[in-house]
Amino acid sequence: SSSYISPEMRALDTQAKSAGLALVNEVGLDPGIDHLMAHYLVENYRASAACNTANDLSFISYCGGIPKIPNPFRYKFSWSPFGVLKALASPSRSLRNFKEFTGDRPWNALSSYDAPLPAPETFEVYPNRDSLPFMEQYKFDPDWRVKDFVRGSLRLNGWAEAWTDVFREIETLKGPEGDQRMTEMSQEFWTKHAYGPNDPDRVVLCVSLQAERDGAVVWHKTYVMDAWGDENGTAMARLVSVPVSLAVQA
């Protein structure tokens, strides 16, 4: 599965191993390819001469599926709008300047990110879900000084402004009636803002690890992917389904 590991799935781990079964999750794009990049960065840093417990580390991982040709809404849907809206109603947890940062809503934690693409481009980014458990998953040493650590979503510049009315309404939704209204919004967005058969999509993924000491950068590496859809299919479908199929084949 390309989905995050659920508590129910995690609880089956011992039972599956005893039965000789492999339950494989988080092997799509995000989560998936981003995990590979993160592990490579951490191992590269650990093996470098610059690795030192006196360093201050900053880790970011931003991923987003966006229209290749920007539209006024600054977004198009390649999957259920309900999932996107539900994520916007969820809090996030990350590290910012050595302190735990909790965002009640993504738009309240929005920042700007200059992606180091061949043609540099600025995006809007925000933390997604709970980033902190991934420090252990990516094998950050417990004695490393981690200044910033965030896994988040990436959007086109102007996204927050275009979605202002959406944010305002989401803040008012509560209980079963709120879920019903979110379902209605999802249907409306799918009608108005879904990708058409000839609409090219784009996926941008940036994963970076930087080490500083006394304010000077001593080690820095970033992995970047900028993929576009074409006549053979969308970039999102390719980058999610191919890794899953490779995992199944393995």
Can you name each region flagged by the protein language model?
Residues 2, 26-30, 34, 123:
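Glycine- and other small-residue-rich loops at beta-strand/loop junctions that grip anionic moieties
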Residues 2-23:
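Rossmann-fold NAD(P)-binding glycine/threonine-rich loop
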Residues 5-10, 30-34, 66-68:
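Short gly/pro/ser/thr-enriched loop/turn and capping motifs at secondary-structure boundaries
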Residues 14, 36, 242-245:
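A broad detector of short, well-ordered amphipathic alpha-helices
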Residues 15-19, 42-43, 77-78:
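Short, hinge-like loop/turn segments at secondary-structure boundaries
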Residues 23-25, 61:
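General beta-strand structural signal in soluble alpha/beta enzymes
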Residues 35-47:
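Active-site-proximal alpha-helical scaffold in enzymes
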Residues 44-250:
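C-terminal catalytic/substrate-binding lobe primarily of soluble NAD(P)-dependent oxidoreductases
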